[in-house]
Amino acid sequence: MASRSLSYTQLLGLLSFILLLVTTTTMAVRVGVILHKPSAPTLPVFREAPAFRNGDQCGTREADQIHIAMTLDTNYLRGTMAAVLSLLQHSTCPENLSFHFLSLPHFENDLFTSIKSTFPYLNFKIYQFDPNLVRSKISKSIRQALDQPLNYARIYLADIIPSSVDRIIYLDSDLVVVDDIEKLWHVEMEGKVVAAPEYCHANFTHYFTRTFWSDPVLVKVLEGKRPCYFNTGVMVVDVNKWRKGMYTQKVEEWMTIQKQKRIYHLGSLPPFLLIFAGDIKAVNHRWNQHGLGGDNFEGRCRTLHPGPISLLHWSGKGKPWLRLDSRKPCIVDHLWAPYDLYRSSRHSLEE
């Protein structure tokens, strides 16, 4: 009886120990899930780009640097890599290009590794953009991609980059540059805050809602202004004037009104038009051949506008890498393809 009782007691003890172990392990896993940082998505793999070096005529001073800002959206990274390659390839002084990348928190280490392995000689820095700055201010627009926090990062650019930078070129990720970016960098701003290709005689009724046009106070904002549209995906910004004029706060004010009254549909663009329309330094249209991604609903193919081209921009729903992968490219997408550094599984097998 004693031996049976002992065995029974040992069995109960063993079961209790196992139950405690399982419970403790489960709790540890649960706590771990709660405390763990958001994991970065699996990033595409890219081929290493060639090294691009300065010509003999290039300066080496800080004043010779050309500052370029872009966002690092993991969904658009393939486009960003192509854009960077195009900038380097067509630059007379590629080592003078200084890149300022804005990314969401938690992803910067993976993105840094991806850029460094693709462009080992690139002069760049990654800055964290806090999505909470805009998340509560974003209103739903006509396309989900326009509602992402990084789409609004350009508004806070002057507050994020170093104070020593007094001019910067902001570029979207769905474009390629086929000219020397130094030409755009040296544009004479003539006292303006923003320089960009400008399209006047625009029909502003398409950009704002009936609520806007029926409000006599809001409509006054556009009184006396030339009805000129510009695409915010390609801008030269006088950062000092932006800071002094407190333009970040001015854009935020319009976003707050939008949240209350729903006065426009197109994401981050309309606030820029309300503030800067007709009051920017106009740049030659060759620096933004935009709309190559088609409209915001179907992304149908479009042809090039007549005239010289320095920059091709796939604004709109259709992106060249997606259309090429689906084997349903538009003709203009083949102009983007030579800059694609994406290493597909097929290419990996061939190597």
Curated annotation (Swiss-Prot):
GO annotation terms (biological process): cell wall organization; pectin biosynthetic process
Lumenal side: 30-351
Pfam family, one: Glyco_transf_8
Ranges facing Cytoplasmic side: 1-8
Gene Ontology CC annotation, any one: pollen tube
UniProt record similarity statement: Belongs to the glycosyltransferase 8 family.
Annotated protein name in UniProt: Probable galacturonosyltransferase-like 4
Gene that encodes the chain: GATL4
